[in-house]
């Protein structure tokens, strides 16, 4: 019973994470006004980043380089969307994200923007 409960909990967390990531993709598509090509390299990079971002949040691991100021200055629209997504994701996964995650997420969002244009 205990093993089953632990397994069920992991499945629940995985489903919750997948749902949260899908909501984030929807937010990006709404912001760009275009669907994201799920076969693109930018999409795959974004998905991998989000998966590891959630994993880092659950373990407390932090990124070494802060890109927030640069991304905010150079790509304010992508940074705004990244900020909104990070807030949404924190609520969905029940963990706080380190503030440096916003800049890295903005970088991936900007790549998706570039592909969507």
Regions found by a protein language model. Name each.
Residues 1-117:
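A cross-family "folded-core" feature that marks the main globular domain of proteins
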